């Protein structure tokens, strides 16, 4: 979902377009539909993410109520190095539960798809945990070479291939001259030169800038970070930012519609977001810096109203009779001042908020006011899996669509 732009600035731009397109045919309806579709799409995605988290909690409760032998089957999917929290995220049970949604065919199919995605995720984790085995063998070989020599490598499960042949010289033995035949394994590399002696050559290897001992720990620490999304209970909810992320003072938001002017406005804590951003103490708007929507309000286009052509003709006739000053046209400053008076304001007055009517109800405000968890991760699932199940209990969204 494309959420690169700030939601508040996008809504302010849409409101300004709605206000400036009153003279166009179908302009108000076009921009209003675009704004409403954007708000409803964000609300729907947030609602679906909440449904994902609820389904995950129900599945965890069903797994806790099962006998212990079923839980041992779930733990068999986990890799030896995986944390216990990732192992608890077992395969989803498709039948036998007391939930009414699990007995429906659509819900059963959706849970089956979630089960397949979970198995793919576990296979990727197994592959990631089995891949860095040679690095661990190299570290074990470096530690066990002084004590046990080549015998220490044979005890490790995945290090049999790295054991040198019987005829290969060890580290303490002198090297023999080169002879034609099978070449032995290369000896361990000596410690690298210090950073001062390292030439600044782009063709130099990467090991010159960093010691070889620093690269394997950094690379070995990166694969265990992948099971983190499965360990958090609400990792289905992290993909879609909510309007509550834009600041603590903007937590309570209400989207309202003026039935007289057909203008949709976002009201926060009893005042407009534009008035809040105009102050220098606003924490979520860049310390009072004007956004992209406010920058466009600097230049106002010339608005024509009924009877304007006749007034301009009268003024031109009156200007032709008098003496023309050397600066230019005589009545140009007066016309410009009169046109600025009819330029619409970029933000409506705060006194008109009482005349605005809420269209989304308590359901929308209850969803957007929730604060997400700090440990959320983007979900690997598609948002269309539980669409039918989530849209079956929609109440506030249908009222919002009917209102338009």
From Swiss-Prot:
<feature type="region of interest" description="Disordered">
    <location>
        <begin position="160"/>
        <end position="231"/>
    </location>
</feature>
<protein>
    <recommendedName>
        <fullName>Immediate early response gene 5-like protein</fullName>
    </recommendedName>
</protein>
<feature type="compositionally biased region" description="Low complexity">
    <location>
        <begin position="195"/>
        <end position="231"/>
    </location>
</feature>
<dbReference type="InterPro" id="IPR008653">
    <property type="entry name" value="IER"/>
</dbReference>
<dbReference type="Pfam" id="PF05760">
    <property type="entry name" value="IER"/>
</dbReference>
<comment type="similarity">
    <text>Belongs to the IER family.</text>
</comment>
<feature type="compositionally biased region" description="Pro residues">
    <location>
        <begin position="177"/>
        <end position="194"/>
    </location>
</feature>
<feature type="region of interest" description="Disordered">
    <location>
        <begin position="308"/>
        <end position="327"/>
    </location>
</feature>
<feature type="compositionally biased region" description="Acidic residues">
    <location>
        <begin position="308"/>
        <end position="318"/>
    </location>
</feature>
<feature type="region of interest" description="Disordered">
    <location>
        <begin position="86"/>
        <end position="107"/>
    </location>
</feature>
